[in-house]
From Swiss-Prot:
One of its GO terms (biological process) is dGTP catabolic process. One of its GO terms (molecular function) is dGTPase activity. The lineage of its organism: Bacteria, Bacillati, Actinomycetota, Actinomycetes, Mycobacteriales. Signal peptide: none annotated. This is Deoxyguanosinetriphosphate triphosphohydrolase-like protein.
Length: 426
């Protein structure tokens, strides 16, 4: 396994030893990274993902996939891939658990709406919110002067969870569309990235990122097939496939021909052909599960082999700060094609845009409701931060933090309250 250092295990705030052990208790022999994983697993922020949208809403269907179930799948894939690469399995799993922890209600649609209302305080980005939750907002470790350090994870754990290790504003003033830290959290990111010589994410973070793509494409396609929104026979319909590839290239970038090539290699797999005949029978459910299992193994196994081969050839040093995940072109094409299937068939649903409009309206209403009623409208923890804020931007950030933390059920209850008040006021 990669030799992690004392610096990797450092925490932002030094913690006192536990003082409530019973007499003659065994010493806690867990590693620092095992403790980190436990902190994330027991966090309220992770549990709230159970009521946040993945591709469809958490209340759609009998066996819905939510941000939480998706995160558990990403964590399992990342642990296996990380172990195969010689990375700490606890860190790899933790990265998967954390990867969506900063996402607000309604997924990417909610993220866009919050970015609009947060314009006065520098915008909103789910990945930057993840760092903020882990190091500030999740109540676990508070210093004597009342400063919150969030879960107070180790440096390596925070780095593993950081997909975009740069702030919104680059040193040259360039504004980044995707980023892993708000400008006001730059000092925390600087501490996390100590020892890195470039902007490349840690190898654990790269592993988490591709595990996310695998889970998103394979498992969400499975959901779509069961729900009747996706028919794998499109892989054999070259006319519809060409149209789908064009849409996928526009949505996710790349060449449509690459997606068509991805479909061609998928058609050659017997498990894909068997799953294409899904009819909700017992045998077809088993065939579908066989396909998801084999595809995950296909992409994880090929990536481990390609990455290890490149390292043996001496193309780079191998480890947390010195590694490049190598994804084989065939795997990349297939994953992007499946991701296109997972997303675009939902996006083409006639009710999708109307549903998104309603979601955005709720976020706008709740933001106005909380802002106008603050600090009394805020939860006690956020109320304290609101009162401590130095300016309007800081106070707006606190309101955005609270909305981002909400489950969809709670946001909808508040939106109804906000509608009632605005109706009463005329």
């Amino acid at each position: 396994m990669y030799p992690y250092s004392e610096s990797d295990a450092q925490r932002l705030h030094q913690e006192a030893p536990k003082a409530s052990q019973l007499a003659h208790s065994e010493v806690d022999l867990r590693s620092d990274f095992s403790r980190d994983r436990a902190r994330v697993l027991h966090s309220a922020a992770l549990r709230r993902l159970a009521d946040k949208t993945q591709v469809v809403g958490p209340r759609d269907g009998d066996t819905p996939r939510t941000r939480l179930t998706h995160s558990l799948e990403v964590a399992q894939i990342a642990r296996g891939m990380g172990s195969g690469l010689g990375l700490d399995p606890e860190l790899s799993e933790l990265a998967g658990l954390c990867h969506d922890i900063g996402h607000p209600p309604y997924g990417h649609n909610g993220e866009k709406a919050l970015n609009e209302v947060a314009a006065a305080c520098g915008g909103f980005e789910g990945n930057a919110q993840t760092l903020r939750i882990l190091t500030r907002l999740e109540p676990k470790v508070v210093s004597a002067d009342g400063t919150s350090f969030g879960l107070n994870l180790t440096r390596a754990a925070l780095d593993a969870a950081c997909k975009y290790p740069w702030t919104k504003t680059s040193p040259d003033g360039t504004i980044n569309r995707k980023y892993g830290a708000y400008d006001e959290d730059a000092h925390i990111l600087e501490w996390v990235r100590r020892g890195h010589t470039d902007l490349r994410p840690s190898l654990e973070a790269q592993t988490m990122d591709f595990s996310d793509d695998i889970a998103y494409s394979v498992h969400d396609v499975e959901d779509g097939i069961v729900a009747g929104r996706i028919d794998l026979k499109v892989l054999w319909d070259l006319v519809e496939l060409a149209a789908l590839a064009q849409k996928g290239a526009r949505a996710f970038g790349g060449d449509p021909e690459e997606l068509i090539e991805g479909a061609a290699t998928l058609r050659e797999l017997p498990v894909v052909a068997a799953a294409a005949d899904f009819d909700a029978s017992l045998s077809s459910y088993a065939a579908l599960k066989a396909m998801t299992s084999e595809l995950v193994g296909r992409y994880v196994g090929s990536t481990i082999a390609a990455t290890r081969a490149a390292a043996r050839l001496g193309e780079y040093e191998f480890g947390r700060m010195h590694g490049e995940l190598v994804i084989r072109p065939e795997a990349d094409r297939e994953v992007r094609l499946l991701k296109t299937l997972a997303v675009l068939y939902v996006m083409d649903d006639p009710g999708h845009l109307a549903r998104q409009d309603r979601q955005r309206d709720r976020i706008f209403r709740v933001f106005d409701y909380l802002t106008l009623g603050a600090p009394g409208s805020l939860d006690p923890m956020y109320r304290q931060w609101f009162l401590e804020a130095d300016d309007d931007a800081g106070r707006a950030r606190v309101v955005v933090d609270q909305i981002a933390s909400m489950t969809e059920s709670r946001l909808e209850r508040l939106a109804r309250n906000a509608s009632g008040i605005s109706g009463f006021l005329g």
